[in-house]
């Protein structure tokens, strides 16, 4: 995965998810905290440096806080200085969805959980090798689920 791949996927290239989690908005509202619902379903953004997850680098996996799909591994996590947890790549093809985002007068690539469509954050082309990508994620959209 590189920036050209992320743009192609955001423009509609095929990116099949491993499965789907289809719930009503009422079910999501009941399952998520108010902050999670605001970020994950309404595409909000948590404040930078609001979570200790930014400085958590213990081995393990990070999953979608909505559906539990494993999205990132701590091996690809890095300190970006942005105030949000940042990763260089997802754990597998198809787990992250990519969408063009022109909100707030900007052109960005939104990252979503490809299983439940939860807003995770954005992807930028300024990350470390080998991908050169920075997956800048909202911590409330993730949960640490397993230690290596």
Label for each model-derived stretch:
Residues 7-9, 14-15, 19-148:
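A short Gly-Trp-Pro
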């Amino acid at each position: 995965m590189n920036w050209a791949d992320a743009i192609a996927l955001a423009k509609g290239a095929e990116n099949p998810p491993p499965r789907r989690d289809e719930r009503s908005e009422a079910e999501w509202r009941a399952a998520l905290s108010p902050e999670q619902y605001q970020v994950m379903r309404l595409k909000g953004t948590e404040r930078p440096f609001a979570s200790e997850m930014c400085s958590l680098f213990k081995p393990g996996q990070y999953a979608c806080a909505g559906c539990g799909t494993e999205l990132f591994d701590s091996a690809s996590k890095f300190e970006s200085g942005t105030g949000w947890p940042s990763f260089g790549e997802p754990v597998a093809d198809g787990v992250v969805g990519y969408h063009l985002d022109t909100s707030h007068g900007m052109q960005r690539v939104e990252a979503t959980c490809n299983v439940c469509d939860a807003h995770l954050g954005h992807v930028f082309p300024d990350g470390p090798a080998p991908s050169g990508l920075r997956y800048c994620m909202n911590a409330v959209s993730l949960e640490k689920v397993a230690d290596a």
